[in-house]
């Protein structure tokens, strides 16, 4: 009963209005009130401020400044093995695995269309049919900048307007084509592991999506698909990013989806749904390496995993079931 009510709210609530209101409030300088909100947020979600470059919450003028806070360099070491692709974000893996022709797993028993995710771009979809995908959810407690899994040359970016459904266990189980319906920014890269797409998916109260090369992509929300292209290689105007380098960020966060071409990478065996991710740890390994590297994510403290799962709505809450 309670789950049905929550799901109904996803369709009834004015999500765009709520998102605009949240974005407006998060950008305001409110002095002591801003600090109070940040302190309450840190306490409720168990945010580890020791990892931040500025651990003192009084140093943030707005909630947005706090939310996209940079981390100290040493807290997210990047796996330097050239055959290893690394995790692009802190969070929890929602789903991962093989793209079955044109189908991507959203939740148990629920798939969505690769072409729909890519806004009907069948040429781009052809690059990833029968390839590999990873969906990473960023909970409120997480670091909300997104980094590169490997070296890449940006070739194309597409902004796709859409809904702003929440991204959680309940909606994943009940909202068809959730990630293909929500607002998103698709980034296509040339890499030494073949083409790679990194998709930043919006949700309710995600105030904006930004990239390091173009700044704020949304808002404004104009309701039309926008497409940009860049030259290859070392041509004038090309955008090259290194493994582990920041590529974008959420102001109030959501989900990152990675797509890899077929036969190019193998996901790290230890990873599964609800695995906790940390930027720089191994995500996948090239299929062309002759010696399989030691690509196992470093074990995390039990309290860190528990805090991440507590903050993640991907974890089914049995108390809500009636």
Swiss-Prot record:
Gene Ontology terms, MF aspect: phosphatidylserine decarboxylase activity
Catalytic activity: a 1,2-diacyl-sn-glycero-3-phospho-L-serine + H(+) = a 1,2-diacyl-sn-glycero-3-phosphoethanolamine + CO2
Feature: compositional bias, Basic and acidic residues: 308-322
Catalytic activity, EC: 4.1.1.65
Primary residence: membrane
Signal sequence annotation: none
Essential cofactor(s): pyruvate
Post-translational modification: Is synthesized initially as an inactive proenzyme. Formation of the active enzyme involves a self-maturation process in which the active site pyruvoyl group is generated from an internal serine residue via an autocatalytic post-translational modification. Two non-identical subunits are generated from the proenzyme in this reaction, and the pyruvate is formed at the N-terminus of the alpha chain, which is derived from the carboxyl end of the proenzyme.
Quaternary structure, from the entry: Heterodimer of a large membrane-associated beta subunit and a small pyruvoyl-containing alpha subunit.
Family: Belongs to the phosphatidylserine decarboxylase family. PSD-B subfamily. Prokaryotic type I sub-subfamily.
Function, as annotated: Catalyzes the formation of phosphatidylethanolamine (PtdEtn) from phosphatidylserine (PtdSer).
Protein name in the entry: Phosphatidylserine decarboxylase proenzyme
Organism: Escherichia coli O9:H4 (strain HS)
Lineage, broadest ranks: Bacteria, Pseudomonadati, Pseudomonadota, Gammaproteobacteria, Enterobacterales
